[in-house]
Amino acid sequence: MAYTFTEKKRLRKSFASRTNTLPVPFLLATQLESYRAFLQEGRSRDERLNEGLQAAFTSIFPIESHSKNARLEYVSYQLGEPVFDIKECQQRGLTYCAPLRAKVRLVIMDKEASKPTIKEVKEQEVYMGEIPLMTPTGSFVINGTERVIVSQLHRSPGVFFEHDRGKTHSSGKLLFSARVIPYRGSWLDFEFDAKDILFFRVDRRRKMPVTILLKALGYTPESILDAFFNKDTFYINTLGIQFELVPERLRGEIARFDICGKDDKVIVAKDKRITAKHIRELDAAGVKKWAVPGEFVVGRVLAHDVVDKDTGELVARANDEITEELLKKLAAAGIDKFQTLYTNDLDHGAFISQTLRTDDTTDEYAAKVAIYRMMRPGEPPTEDAVNALFVNLFFSDERYDLSAVGRMKFNRRIGRDELTGTGTLSTEDIVAVIKILVELRNGRGEIDDIDHLGNRRVRSVGELAENQFRAGLVRVERAVRERLSQAESDNLMPHDLINAKPVSAAIKEFFGSSQLSQFMDQTNPLSEITHKRRVSALGPGGLTRERAGFEVRDVHPTHYGRVCPIETPEGPNIGLINSLALFARTNWYGFIETPYRKVVDNKVTDEIEYLSAIEESKYVIAQANAELDAKGKFKDDLVSCRFKNEFTLSAPDRIEYMDVAPAQIVSVAASLIPFLEHDDANRALMGSNMQRQAVPCLRPEKPFVGTGIERTAAVDSGTVVIAHRGGRVDYVDAGRIVIRVHDEEARAGEVGVDIYSLIKYTRSNQNTNINQRPLVKVGDVIARGDVIADGASTDMGELALGQNMLVAFMPWNGYNFEDSILINEKVVAEDRYTSIHIEELSVVARDTKLGPEEITRDISNLAERQLARLDESGIIAIGAEVEAGDVLVGKVTPKGETQLTPEEKLLRAIFGEKASDVKDTSLKVPSGMSGVVIDVQVFTREGIERDKRAQSIIDTQLAEYKKDLTDRMRIVEDDTFARLEKLLHLKVVNGGPKKLAKGSKISKEYLDSLNRHDWFDIRLADDEASRQVESLKDSLTQKRVEFDAMFEEKKQKLTAGDELPPGVQKMVKVYLAVKRRLQPGDKMAGRHGNKGVVSKIVPVEDMPFMADGRPVDIVLNPLGVPSRMNIGQILETHLGWASKGLGEKIGQMMAAQTKSVVKELRHFFKEVYNQSGKAEDIDNFTDDEILELGQNLQKGVPFASPVFDGATEEEIRRMLALAGLPEGGQVTLYDGRTGEAFDRQVTVGYKHVLKLHHLVDDKMHARSTGPYSLVTQQPLGGKAQFGGQRFGEMEVWALEAYGASYVLQEMLTVKSDDVNGRTKVYENIVKGDHKIEAGMPESFNVLVKEIRSLGIDIDLERY
């Protein structure tokens, strides 16, 4: 069993009873693959598939002019290189993007030629705007901030049949409807009303009888009836009227007269119901026709037009009802045969026939006119416009597209075998939909479930971007078509025709402000992954919160293994925003698939197949926890399975597939909760959501009890640094790791060195700290894919969101009432929950009307202490500790000339001009903030001279880059000279430095005596060897030139002016690191939805302690467990205690330092790791590795209890016993204040507890005086506005109830909106006279004005 570099250092004991057949796939694959398919970068023009950008271009081009004399054709496109890398874009506030250029061809036809002849062709590359590029971690950098495009779950194109569940009509009758939804174009609805007449509507406009649409499609009334009805045939002869018998149609009917056989024997008596027996008898008797009375025919409906053969006169029309007069007419006209529609009340309704009666259009054109009037009311219908509109509705490629998915779903639903076809609708398609709808109304067939994941598909980034790009191109197309007519006469080139602005505007708008383009949640690595794996039903073309009903939000059986049933927000978005399940992926059509193991001949194989929700319902699928024997066959006679979205028990021989893993049904966040199977679903939901809010701690600590997904989550999130290639570590410091690559992994002619620059103290989107720490030391040998540096919230390559705390479940003086949390002061002293938050403060110097603003140190009225910290450029020094109100960047703004007061005149006389014509607009630290300045960045517009600070920042960056290049050059040189030495050793020479004699052999001593660069001057006798020496020399020189060019390019980039917004001359960004310690009011939570607020931090000596004197870290209320039903936290606590106990045991073994310590450790590890669950290959570890493992496990042996396959009670007891702890998990605690034992034993153990991003420091806020609202003159609200506390209606009631009239008066006047009163109070306080004179509150004046505006005169009279 191969272990990675970090796994070997700290093995996690897994209790999984079954091995995963399929490793967890790369978690960000959906985003990355979708965008890769959109760009199709790196593919040649001929290899590109018709998707993404390619599809957008080919769907719009070629563009023809109105006269057809010129056309613009698309050839290919290519993406350029981005100007700035990701980090530079973030610093400068730019978008990380690449220029897109399309090669187009302008073809001009010869007008004079009789047949189409090409006159000239011009080909050219045209700039089409910038396309944002995706970072390797699946996000986008837009205007300097990281954003994520969330995938959208929308209704798949195709045809859907449903009914109104009896809600529309008071009778509760089911009204059936069908809807054809295209990917792009008009929606077509068909619906029955309460009178069983079938209507259609386009784009939810006015409804019209469906026969109008059929007539517009070219059907006559006769052909309509022919398409939808079976016929009964009647003959008129001398015997009267005879009826051609179709026995099957008579079942269930009541005979209106005696039905006799050939021998006049009565088979069915009058008024009796005809049964299957009667039908068999009729068949046997060979009755084909029988005579019927006239009333049997009356009331039936004619199926076709009836024409008098002699005169050619129309006797009756199709769909006319037969009356006695009409029968006489038919007989008189010599009609000997006619057909009627076969209908009955049970399963052959006369719906189309009734609809045809309500329709008064006469022919195809009249029907089209009716549709035109419905679509464009008030416009005069001309023949061309009428025909064009009808064709454009559903039959034009430009206006209508079902898409490949829509066509596949459509054909599948209407029962066709082929799944491909055109994107537009055909007459047959529309008729097929109407037929199915009529069948549904007749009681045959099933309606569709719109919440089934086979009817909802995912639109990922690539597809959403493609739609926007196409929308931009459509705007371009209109402009190009206008200009094409001039192309010939004005001799224009393609770039004159195409204006790329609409395209870039559409793309920019989508990435910048679309509802699905969201500011990335970057609190910790898990929140990043979850955000990128999110699927939302909201957004353009999706649902809205208000309209979404309960059914859409509910968990559906098809969510199994596709969408997580647990992780979704609480509140208005519940069920509309979901997370992809752990193993889910989207297929080519956009439907979510989940993997299954194939079962062949009762044996579960390791062959994996992905099934979508549509395919899955056909198979019987066993769950992952089904018991298998050694051969992979099912042990039980009945196995719990799923079939047709129902849970059922099935015999093993019927099973066709089996789940891949027990964790298959949940998302990443839910799969990180150990013992999830013991938690109530509501609490599991809160647990999944709160893990995403955990703030990275200063020293991350791996969870003692995890699930085994921690490593996958950390690696896939991109927060840890992964080795791209194997090699040996050459150099390590806090900021970079240099690795000399193994020869077999280095490509020819390439530098065999990888340099990883680590991210140091960088601000995330949520102001948390991202910092990477190296895990390797010089000389370590690492393989490809190993974790070489930890990031935020990771510990040795594993996700570590919180800290392991010693927890006791007991009440403590009411301080843990209602979920409050009691914390040991030691936790704060040891900085266990201290986190660093980085605030970015920026200031810009603009060019104003009165002159440019200036960033300077020369500011009047600034205290010496403040000035001392600013450098000569007026910018604060890095490392300075600052508090609220301190100046960070000095800035002055020119001030307009104003009338000077005598005092100002005096100041001007003393200090000269400068003092009065500028005002101080320096960047100061906002209220309530303090910290340390950790970085400063200065951006200067092109053409404006840089100050010394800006220059020194550039110099530092260049020096760092030079250091990187020098390292790479050093390794290249070492590598080259090592090869050269091997080549020269013991070779015969013709001569060389230090008078080397011809014919002598080169010794190692001789080479050591020379400078390495002089080795190239040795002249070898062997020509081939000489050529190799020359080749090495050339490649070394080439590398040096290459590196010099790279340095120059970097220098050029840094020294060039920065792109800044218009009018901005200079911008300075200052980064503050703020240390936040744990304090009362901070919110904390476990992973099981158990959240609370810190109520008190108790001195160590007062905390309850164990018999060995160890005080507990946290005291939680035991009443928080039973009603919430999240028992997982108790099991975690027990197993966490075992983990710590085993760690201490290992520590004791290591401390004993006996000779046999390695042997003892190896034996103990086998006890821990190999008695149950997944076995580990302990024998494969070397003695040094065993010792290092022991060293790392002293704090605690990490356990993995995978979801739905976790540790059993027996296994937890066994681990507690192995650690020498009580198996019950309870122990006697002593009161820290009295030293007495508590009455009964208390559950104690270790639990992973998180500090959440709801910190009291961010919420606490106080105001003295501040801004007021303009209209009401009341203080603004909220911390951001530096607002006041609202004294609302209920608070007023409270004071009224107390009778505190003076307090109430000042609350409603001088402390709020009595403008004069509050100024007076301020003056009085200054004078030392503490009087209050309350006046009229401004809001009363507003009320008076409101009443006057209603036309009611209101005046105040003084008494």
From Swiss-Prot:
Q: Which CDD domains match?
A: RNA_pol_B_RPB2
Taking the record's annotation, the residue ranges forming a coiled coil are none
- Record keyword Nucleotidyltransferase present: yes
- Answer yes or no on keyword Transcription: yes
The UniProt catalytic activity note for this protein reads:
RNA(n) + a ribonucleoside 5'-triphosphate = RNA(n+1) + diphosphate
Q: Give any Gene Ontology cellular component.
A: DNA-directed RNA polymerase complex
User: Which InterPro entries does this one have?
Assistant: DNA-dir_RNA_pol_bsu_ext_1_sf, DNA-dir_RNA_pol_bsu_external_1, DNA-dir_RNA_pol_su2, DNA-dir_RNAP_su2_dom, DNA-dir_RNAP_su2_hyb_sf, RNA_pol_bsu_bac, RNA_pol_bsu_CS, RNA_pol_bsu_protrusion
Its EC number is 2.7.7.6
Under Gene Ontology molecular function, one entry of this record is: DNA binding
Keywords associated with the record: DNA-directed RNA polymerase, Nucleotidyltransferase, Transcription, Transferase
Enzyme class at the top of the EC tree: transferase
What GO terms in the biological process aspect are recorded for it?
DNA-templated transcription
Which SUPFAM superfamilies does this entry report, sorted A to Z?
A: beta and beta-prime subunits of DNA dependent RNA-polymerase (SSF64484)
Subunit and interaction comment: The RNAP catalytic core consists of 2 alpha, 1 beta, 1 beta' and 1 omega subunit. When a sigma factor is associated with the core the holoenzyme is formed, which can initiate transcription.
PANTHER family from the UniProt entry: DNA-DIRECTED RNA POLYMERASE I SUBUNIT 2
For this protein, the record's NCBIfam families field holds: PRK00405.1, rpoB
Q: Which HAMAP family match?
A: RNApol_bact_RpoB (MF_01321)
Similarity annotation: Belongs to the RNA polymerase beta chain family.
Q: What does this protein do?
A: DNA-dependent RNA polymerase catalyzes the transcription of DNA into RNA using the four ribonucleoside triphosphates as substrates.
Name of this chain's protein:
DNA-directed RNA polymerase subunit beta
Name the species this protein comes from: Thiobacillus denitrificans (strain ATCC 25259 / T1)
Q: Which gene encodes it?
A: rpoB
